[in-house]
Regions:
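Solvent-exposed loop/turn and edge beta-strand elements of beta-rich ligand-binding domains
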Residues: 1-374
């Protein structure tokens, strides 16, 4: 037909623990219509469009504009748009690259509407329509039937929706030929998901001070600790740390809950690092796994959507709030903790015990000797 195509995909950025190599040239490196990310993560977007067939001035392009609309929980990073042109659909045979300083396109942001418009300027359209670098001795001209790839990034914020209610992002391509009085449009979208946990801390005898209980949360899949900030009684993930000491210490609220939102679908370990005096600290970390699977189809883009499920210590749990939150309960029992085997404390207990036994034996022998003398 000679008309353009439009495909938009997303991935979690490599530096935000994305499951990809971070390639800037491989269009299949982790990109898909769906992705999972944590709050504070950077997500990479790419828009790929096959340009229409151009054979004359009449069939040349007079308009080629993208309007990208983010949901409330995702914000464009801004000033990072790059456009590349390729001879092939696989984006391996590059023709040229434009950045925002090239003058070939203009970018405009509307923060209130959370949109970004990318419009080809006159010089950009002129190059697309008339460049002589691709075709010789052909009826085609310019970048006819070539592939345009646009890349940019955004950040997942605390406003992101959790669970199977995703955070969609739609792009609309508006284009027109010089010999037409009407515009044509194409649409595509992709979806970002994020999740959370709700830890209920209890004492078996209903005693204990909840404020003395402390936890650390480790992402086992990415081998990092969670950093979060608290707002209105809820912790929102905002980053990660390599060292445990740099991670957030999670403390239950007055009702015993620790709610952490903005976690991607990964495996986690929840470790209790402190509890109230007179109670036994949890011996093992609680193992939490959040998984996703394809379920349903987007009415706009036709992509398979995701649904979440979870396990706690290997057992299936029913997620709440539309598969958004993993619920779990942690109980401390009265008692006291012995130092760990092989530690300094064990040696002190051993030496102390031997000393006490020696003293007792000495007292018994001394007592018997004293009675004998009498």
């Amino acid at each position: 037909t000679g008309n353009p195509t439009l495909d938009k995909t997303v991935r979690e950025d490599k530096n935000s623990t994305g499951k990809n190599t971070g390639s800037l040239t491989n269009t299949t490196d982790g990109y898909a219509h769906t992705a999972s990310a944590s709050i504070g993560d950077t997500v990479d977007y790419q828009i790929i469009s096959t340009l229409p067939t151009i054979t004359s001035k009449a069939s040349s392009l007079s308009e080629y504009t993208y309007v990208d609309t983010m949901s409330k929980g995702i914000r464009h990073n801004k000033n990072d748009v790059v456009i590349e042109f390729f001879r092939d659909a696989g984006c391996t045979d590059k023709i040229t690259t434009w950045d925002e300083s090239s003058g070939r396109f203009a970018v405009a942001y509307d923060d209130a509407a959370n949109t970004m418009a990318i419009r080809m300027t006159e010089s950009g359209l002129s190059e697309i329509n008339e460049a002589a670098t691709v075709y010789t001795d052909s009826v085609k001209r310019g970048y006819s039937d070539c592939t345009m790839r646009i890349t940019y990034a955004a950040t997942l914020t605390a406003d992101a929706k959790t669970g199977d209610t995703d955070n969609p992002n739609e792009v609309v391509l508006t284009w027109r030929r010089a010999n037409n009085t009407y515009f044509d449009t194409l649409r595509d979208c992709c979806h970002v998901y994020t999740y959370g946990i709700d830890v209920l801390k209890q004492f078996s005898d209903n005693g204990g001070n909840l404020r003395n209980v402390k936890f650390k949360l480790h992402n086992d899949s990415d081998d990092c600790y969670i950093i979060a900030e608290q707002k209105d009684g809820v912790y929102y993930a905002k980053g990660f740390a390599a060292k445990k000491a740099d991670a957030t210490t999670f403390v239950p609220n007055s009702s015993g809950h620790i709610v952490v939102k903005g976690l991607e679908d990964d495996a986690y370990s929840l470790t209790e690092i402190a509890t109230d005096k007179g109670y036994v600290l949890l011996r093992d970390a609680v193992k939490i796994v959040i998984k996703t699977a394809e379920n349903g189809q987007c009415e706009k883009c036709g992509a398979k959507l995701l649904t979440a499920s979870a396990t706690v210590n290997g057992k299936d749990v029913t997620m709440t709030d539309g598969n958004a939150i993993v619920p779990l309960t942690v109980v401390n029992n009265p008692g006291f903790d012995l130092p760990k085997t092989g530690g300094y404390g064990t040696w002190m207990f051993t030496i102390g015990g031997v000393a006490l036994l020696g003293a007792a034996a000495f007292i018994v022998v001394k007592s018997r000797k004293h009675r004998g003398e009498q």
